[in-house]
Amino acid sequence: ILLSYPTMSEVEVEVEKPWAPVLMPLQTVSVKIRRKRHIAYLGLGSNMGDRESYLDFAIDELNKDEYTKVTKVSDFIETEPYGGVEQDNFLNGCIEVETLHSPDELLHLINAIEKDAGRERLIHWGPRTLDIDILLYDDLVCDEENLHIPHIEMCKREFVLEPLSNIAGYKRHPLNGKTIRELLDEMDRNEE
């Protein structure tokens, strides 16, 4: 239903079966499901080969997915590598996506896109053709083994906050309540 009606943001469907053949005295049995569009912010980065082409590839691949649409794209910025590994500079940016995927499904999708771009996970914080991180997903707070939302390190990384403030400066961090712009301003003041 949501795919057929792009202006609809949420739908709830309930199917009832009267006089269902169950061994209990019930008038009806029903199943209810709710689906909605979610807004997620993703960080993009590349420091190998044609960096901008890899970032564009990620955006194109996300738009090819029938359950995901890229709605905003930040400017791309060149940044020094993070994490102490000697390597080339990164090109970083952020995007806003509207998605019907759950956080786990979205993670699976972006991991597949990274793999299609030739990403190899050999060195922690090492060079990569394409890196895609889920930064924010609605106002969700999630702390699982392979998925942390909001992204654990996002408040410490200017290469995330700067492009994110370009497209979502007034979006609030779900844990500390500060806007992305406030987090970036704090980082700038601390560097002075």
Residue ranges of predicted features:
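Residue-level signal for beta-strand positions within conserved beta-sheet cores that form or flank
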Residues: 9, 66-69, 130, 157
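A general secondary-structure junction signal
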Residues: 15, 74-77, 134
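Nucleotide and nucleotide-moiety/phosphate-recognizing core
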Residues: 34-44, 48-123, 139
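Flexible, gly/pro- and Lys/Arg-enriched active-site loops
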Residues: 82-90, 101-192
